[in-house]
Amino acid sequence: TLTTKLHGGYVKSLEDRDRIFNEQLNKTGAEYFDYYLLHAIGRDMYENKYLKFDCFNWLREKKRLGLVKHIGFSFHDSAAVLDRILTEQPDMEFVQLQLNFLDWESEGVQSRLCYEVACKHGVPVIVMEPVKGGSLVNLPSEADAILRSLGDGSNASYAIRFAASFDNVCMVLSGMGSMEMVRDNISYMKDFKPLTPEEMGGVKRVADVFRSQNLISCTACNYCTERCPKNIPIPAYFAC
């Protein structure tokens, strides 16, 4: 499966859309992409980039031509904004959401609310940030003890299985930096079993520990460092 995206930050004219797309085809040597998404949509990006430059209709045309098999977008905003977009763009085939057990009830990320909006519109969800940039793997001792009491699964396994336990989730993206991580992911996803009620209760208790300790909710996506005028490695300081 081959997937890539159109980043609105690089689109400054109608011509940029095809230029970027053709460069992506040339660099990959592919004839088409299985999944193609409009990247990091929120209200501002939706209105000032993707609508302004007619990117949804452009993407539909790529699908009509057979250059893209499935079209959708990744999303970072409120459930209300997502509802508006899916109402205005009803033929989107997937939406990529930040979904993990820490952000599930977050007032800022609104994972649960956004998931419910996708369900309402019948749009499958692809999950990003299931381990929240590693935050749900490298746990505080109190939280780690909770997961250890559930069994011998890795911390990542509980986080990724949480994300994959919802009926409308069609795919979970997992950033893997070693063969050990690949093997670990395969071990519990090959013959997947959703979290049991006991395990679901355990990960919710882990989320409570995070909230009680006022830990900084950072995914280490580094978007902030790209915009920092002093080039401060902000996620690295948060991780200290």
Per-region residue spans from a language model:
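N-terminal glycine-rich cofactor-binding segment that shapes the pocket for flavin-like pterin cofactors
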Residues: 1-4
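Glycine/proline-rich, positively charged
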Residues: 8-131, 138-144, 150-151, 163-165
